[in-house]
Amino acid sequence: DIAAHLVKEKEKYDLEYIWLISSDKDWDLLVQNNVSRFSYVTRKEVTLENWNDHYDVTPEEYISLKCLTGDKGDNVPGIPGIGPKRALGLIKEYGDAISIYDHVPLPGKYKYIESLNENYEQIPQNYELMDLITYCDDAIGADNISVIRGIMDAA
């Protein structure tokens, strides 16, 4: 939440560039102009310029993909029966997770469509959990953050 707040308010804090150092791909939700994530595990950096080397969706579509497929590491359930390929197809057809939610019930007899129609209420809940930027100030209390510049004395 603190990283999301700094990304959201980078102009306010006069931050030219933000490197997020983490192996957690959730932080890729924060990648934008002048914000990248470096994985200390893979030794690779994710930027807007090389985004397509890492993902089959746009940065804007990434949150929708995560809303539909979930995130086991963060205990965010996806829609049963919907993996990345099916999620990508739905995103391409409807635009984003919220538009999919708005179109429920979806027509079709496939099991994953039936599952989506039965579990669609999970979409806005997942969106709120995954949307780091929108909800970061509520989570940390924006008034509790300050940026200290200069050399810090270790003593």
Model-predicted regions and their roles:
Residues 153-155:
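Long, highly charged low-complexity segments enriched in Glu/Asp and Lys/Arg with interspersed Ser/Thr
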